[in-house]
Amino acid sequence: MNNSNRLRLTWISYFSYALTGALVIVTGMVMGNIAEYFNLPIASMSNTFTFLNAGILISIFLNAWLMEIIPLKRQLVFGFILMLIAIAGLMVGHNLMIFSISMFILGVVSGITMSIGTFLITHMYEGRQRGSRLLFTDSFFSMAGMIFPVAAAILLARHIEWYWVYACIGLLYVGIFVLTLCSEFPVLGHKATDQSKPVAKEKWGMGVLFLAIAALCYILGQLGFIQWVPEYATKTFNMDISQAGQLVSNFWISYMIGMWVFSFILRFFDLQRIVTVLAALATLSMYMFVSTNNPEHLSYYILALGFVSSAIYTTLITLGSLQTKVSSPKLVNFILTCGTVGTMLTFVVTGPIVANSGVHAALATANGLYLTVFVMCLILGFFTKHRSHGHVTH
């Protein structure tokens, strides 16, 4: 593979994470406007976003096998067509069924693209370089989380319809589409070389179970927290939508900076030990945010939370890919799928909590999930295989 092609594939991975980040994170900003558009209470409206998360989950799960059947390039081109259909559905369809179907299609496109992006990085890079590359790739998720809530707030403040936010997000896939047409992709499945055969036979080990639980709890906790921060800030502290949007942007700015910092730091530390420390610090930072009664402190705590939690999910994926001697697409997709289950459950879990006990209870639940991540990372230390495979020295 020549360097220019590798660079194009790497940028496809970057944009794939930005696309998923934009779709998932912007939900909290537009939810109120969409609820008003369909004349539904916000707690009920949140349940319809499960279609987005379900689409992401199903496509990531199935793509572990589809990547070996349908060429990656063909999947991404087909994804572009689906993206156009979904955004057109949001714009011209004025009923809840069309909205739900369009969100599901967006989820499918996002999941396919993200699973391909993750595989490309794990395929092209090895050892600790894989971890730092994945972390930098994941920073585009948070970069989108920084940019699109601000863009959404600007559009909504000017009384521009909410669906134009999704049209803006669709521009990311235009970039993916153009790069895809110019790139050559690795071949998987029966057409690939025999090097991929040992991957299917190698046992994953118990460590993968703890990584999977940690990935699920982390994403569920993170999104359960950040999706309700705007509602919490406006209702509890009487902030306006711009101030609430700034809180969310602060989180993702800090998250992005943390990723860049840790993409250099991680190569000097054992991945299991550092992810355990980061999970503990993230749990403490979220507790401080949820517990404070001073609105002036919210920005400090959410900045700290964004920074220390930035490397957790990507490190979990990297540790998963290092549980076998040869990187397995199915193992990586399994960890991704578990994380995406957390995405899908975000409003299924937090919606009823908000309806029955209020937004603060949902944030406290997210804090408990972060504590679970810490416990899983701690236990992982007794079962992980990444040291015995020699990956720690790469």
Curated annotation (Swiss-Prot):
GO cellular component: plasma membrane
Molecular function, one GO term: transmembrane transporter activity
UniProt key word Transmembrane: yes
Main location: membrane
Membrane-traversing stretches: 11-31, 51-71, 76-96, 101-121, 134-154, 162-182, 206-226, 246-266, 274-294, 302-322, 334-354, 363-383
Record-linked InterPro entries: MFS, MFS_dom, MFS_trans_sf, MFS_TsgA, MFS_TsgA-like
UniProt cross-references to Pfam families, sorted A to Z: MFS_1 (PF07690)
Keyword Endoplasmic reticulum: no
Topology with respect to the bilayer: Multi-pass membrane protein
Keywords, sorted A to Z: Cell inner membrane, Cell membrane, Membrane, Transmembrane, Transmembrane helix
Cellular compartment(s): Cell inner membrane
NCBIfam families given in the database record: PRK03699.1
Stored HAMAP family: MFS_TsgA
Family membership: Belongs to the major facilitator superfamily. TsgA family.
Protein name: Protein TsgA homolog
Gene name for this UniProt entry: tsgA
